[in-house]
């Protein structure tokens, strides 16, 4: 309310569609429910456990995990879906015989190299590595690891580490003006305090 001067909030609907049970699944159930409460107070309608199966000029079609379908009439849509891997991943898999997961990410060794190809590193959201989400901190950490390994090889020394280990520095998401959620280790915050931390 008050954010978009040209939109009458009494005539508009904001509908969040998500395939998960609650918003922001990486933040856990507790913060997901807090997010749900905050969005509901803002008048956001939530369609959880639902996937978009069709979008056209007049609306959006959803399919719920339960199997039921729903049509939402809409002239304005905002798509903010997750990331999908680059087509380069599938091409790399086909060219080298490497395993590629459903999302198009390439399975890598513990040192982030392609199985059978120690000269090829696959990094960031193109790599399929257990416990590493497709976010910037995963990409940065994997790039630093690979850079150190390559530099060590060129200098004829051992790398600082022989296996990549991801360190989750935490996640933050802003929900609305002066409202956010933060998860850093065991610390969880919501509301204004989380927004200030963000």
Feature locations, PLM:
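A structured beta-alpha segment of the ubiquitous adenosine-cofactor-binding alpha/beta core
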Residues: 52, 63-70
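Alpha-helix termini
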Residues: 1-8, 66-67, 153, 157
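Hydrophobic/aromatic beta-strand patches that form the interior of the parallel beta-sheet core
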Residues: 15-17, 47, 78, 121-123, ...
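C-terminal, flexible cofactor-proximal segment of oxidoreductases
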Residues: 142-198
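FAD-site-proximal beta/loop scaffold in flavoenzymes
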Residues: 59, 72-144, 148-152
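Cofactor-binding loop segments of dinucleotide-utilizing enzymes, especially the Rossmann-like FAD-
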Residues: 19, 125, 177
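Rossmann-like dinucleotide-binding cores of NAD(P)H-dependent redox enzymes
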Residues: 1-50
């Amino acid at each position: 309310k008050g954010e978009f001067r040209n939109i009458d909030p009494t005539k508009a609907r904001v509908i969040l569609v998500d395939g998960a049970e609650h918003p922001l699944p990486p933040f856990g159930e507790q913060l997901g429910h807090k997010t749900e409460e905050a969005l509901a107070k803002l008048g956001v309608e939530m369609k959880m456990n639902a996937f978009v199966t069709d979008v056209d000029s007049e609306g959006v079609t959803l399919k719920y995990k339960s199997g039921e379908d729903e049509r939402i009439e809409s002239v304005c849509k905002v798509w903010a879906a997750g990331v999908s891997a680059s087509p380069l991943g599938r091409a790399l898999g086909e060219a080298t015989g490497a395993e590629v997961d459903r999302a198009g990410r390439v399975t890598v060794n513990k040192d982030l190299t392609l199985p059978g190809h120690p000269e090829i590193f696959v990094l960031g959201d193109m790599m399929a590595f257990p416990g590493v989400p497709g976010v910037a901190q995963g990409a940065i950490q994997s790039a630093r690891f690979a850079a150190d390994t390559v530099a060590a090889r060129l200098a004829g020394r051992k790398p600082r580490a022989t296996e990549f280990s991801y360190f989750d520095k935490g996640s933050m998401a802003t929900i609305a003006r002066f409202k956010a959620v933060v998860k850093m280790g065991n610390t969880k915050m919501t509301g204004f305090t989380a927004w200030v931390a963000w």
